[in-house]
Swiss-Prot record:
<feature type="transmembrane region" description="Helical">
    <location>
        <begin position="174"/>
        <end position="194"/>
    </location>
</feature>
<keyword id="KW-0560">Oxidoreductase</keyword>
<feature type="transmembrane region" description="Helical">
    <location>
        <begin position="276"/>
        <end position="296"/>
    </location>
</feature>
<keyword id="KW-0472">Membrane</keyword>
<keyword id="KW-0350">Heme biosynthesis</keyword>
<dbReference type="InterPro" id="IPR023754">
    <property type="entry name" value="HemeA_Synthase_type2"/>
</dbReference>
<comment type="subunit">
    <text>Interacts with CtaB.</text>
</comment>
<feature type="transmembrane region" description="Helical">
    <location>
        <begin position="305"/>
        <end position="325"/>
    </location>
</feature>
<keyword id="KW-0408">Iron</keyword>
<keyword id="KW-1133">Transmembrane helix</keyword>
<dbReference type="GO" id="GO:0005886">
    <property type="term" value="C:plasma membrane"/>
</dbReference>
<comment type="function">
    <text>Catalyzes the conversion of heme O to heme A by two successive hydroxylations of the methyl group at C8. The first hydroxylation forms heme I, the second hydroxylation results in an unstable dihydroxymethyl group, which spontaneously dehydrates, resulting in the formyl group of heme A.</text>
</comment>
<feature type="binding site" description="axial binding residue">
    <location>
        <position position="335"/>
    </location>
    <ligand>
        <name>heme</name>
    </ligand>
</feature>
<feature type="transmembrane region" description="Helical">
    <location>
        <begin position="111"/>
        <end position="131"/>
    </location>
</feature>
<feature type="binding site" description="axial binding residue">
    <location>
        <position position="274"/>
    </location>
    <ligand>
        <name>heme</name>
    </ligand>
</feature>
<keyword id="KW-1003">Cell membrane</keyword>
<dbReference type="GO" id="GO:0006784">
    <property type="term" value="P:heme A biosynthetic process"/>
</dbReference>
Length: 367
């Protein structure tokens, strides 16, 4: 009897060790995906700020990997760009060499997006067929893969909005594109954090988990609002802080009819709402930190709340600086990257309240 119990215990320990090894491999893979997604969002921000997003006027998911390689091919690509309103109304007289500059930004963005698809799909297939992915994670990971494929379509849908009548992409489609990218990033972070070891600290308060979730959701919504700001160049409508043209609430916020359309199409209103969102996020993070420190100052959850508030504060400072400097490219990209850092940490903090995924003892290893 004792021998059987010992054998069972040894088998269990072996299974636990195998599970931990598998989880380390999955975490390493997801960390690489998260890093690549972060880089993609930064390149996407630079592509937008340099007004390069419409330089490639065709969607070629496979052949588009290869850029123009000869003078004739560059001339043909440039001729395609010369047909769209952005060239006619903004960049008339641009040379081929100047066109190459904006082309490379958009090409790099698309190439990196394709690369992330490979980085995600191939390891997913390998980990799946070798039994390294726990059953509870299979459907979520497939969902992320499907959302990533859909994001490619959304990207072209966004670009196509600026090829016929507009000189820039639709702010609605830009916001959709960026928000889906951030959803993919958040989902990967949620799973990654769930595979990491967690502390056994008690929650600082019963409301702490809900507050952490509210901060994460508000961070994502603020990114959506920021994308609307970017799509309308609303960051240039008021370049003063804390007042807007000398007022807390500027005039002309609801001049368009119906009134609700101002929230999406009036640059002044859009910037005002984005500012309000930033103040709300700052207040939520501050409240969460104070409540956590008062309830349980020595816990990991409380320490994370301090770091989260610090990140929100730094991001607010970057946003204000970007505004005052009238949105230079470097600061604009930094602000977009900072938003993703805040979102990622907010998601990890929220997931920390849930704890590690329970071990799936039914994992099957196959050579």
């Amino acid at each position: 009897m004792a021998h059987a119990e010992l054998a069972t215990e040894q088998m269990l320990l072996k299974e636990i060790g195998r599970t931990e090894r598998n989880r380390r491999q999955i975490r390493g893979w997801l960390a690489a995906v998260l890093f690549a997604l972060f880089a993609l969002v930064l390149v996407g921000g630079a592509t937008r700020l340099t007004e390069s997003g419409l330089s490639i006027t065709e969607w070629k998911p496979v052949h588009g990997v290869i850029p123009p390689l000869s003078a004739e091919e560059w001339e043909e690509e440039f001729r395609l760009y010369q047909r769209i309103p952005q060239y006619e109304q903004i960049n008339k007289g641009m040379t081929v060499d100047e066109f190459k500059t904006i082309f490379w930004w958009e090409w790099a963005h698309r190439l990196l997006a394709r690369g992330i698809g490979v980085i995600f799909a191939l390891p997913l297939f390998f980990f799946w067929v070798t039994g390294r992915i726990e059953r509870r994670l299979r459907l979520p990971l497939l969902g992320i893969l499907a959302l990533g494929g859909f994001q490619g379509f959304i990207g072209w849908w966004m670009v196509s909005s600026g090829l016929a009548e507009r000189t820039a992409v639709s702010q609605y489609r830009l916001a959709t594109h960026l928000t889906i990218a951030c959803l993919i990033f958040a989902a990967c972070m949620w799973i990654y954090r769930g595979l990491c070891p967690h502390s056994d600290d008690a929650h600082p308060t019963k409301r702490s988990q809900g507050m952490a979730g509210a901060i994460a959701i508000m961070s994502l919504f603020q990114i959506y609002l920021g994308a609307i700001v970017a799509g309308l160049d609303a960051g240039l409508s008021y370049n003063t802080w804390p007042l807007m043209d000398g007022a807390i609430v500027p005039g002309g916020l609801f001049v368009q009819q119906p009134a609700w359309i101002n929230l999406f199409e009036n640059p002044k209103t859009v910037q005002f709402v984005h500012r309000l969102g930033a103040y709300l996020l700052f207040a939520l993070a501050l409240w969460h930190m104070i409540a956590s420190l008062r309830a349980a100052p020595e816990t990991t959850h409380a320490r994370r709340s301090v770091l989260l508030f610090a990140l929100v504060t730094v991001q607010a400072a970057i946003g204000i600086t970007t505004l005052l400097l009238q949105v230079p490219i470097g600061w604009g990209v930094l602000h977009q990257g900072g938003a993703l850092v805040v979102l990622g940490f907010a998601i990890a903090h929220w997931r920390g309240f849930v704890g590690t995924y329970p071990r799936d003892t039914a994992i099957e290893m196959r050579d």
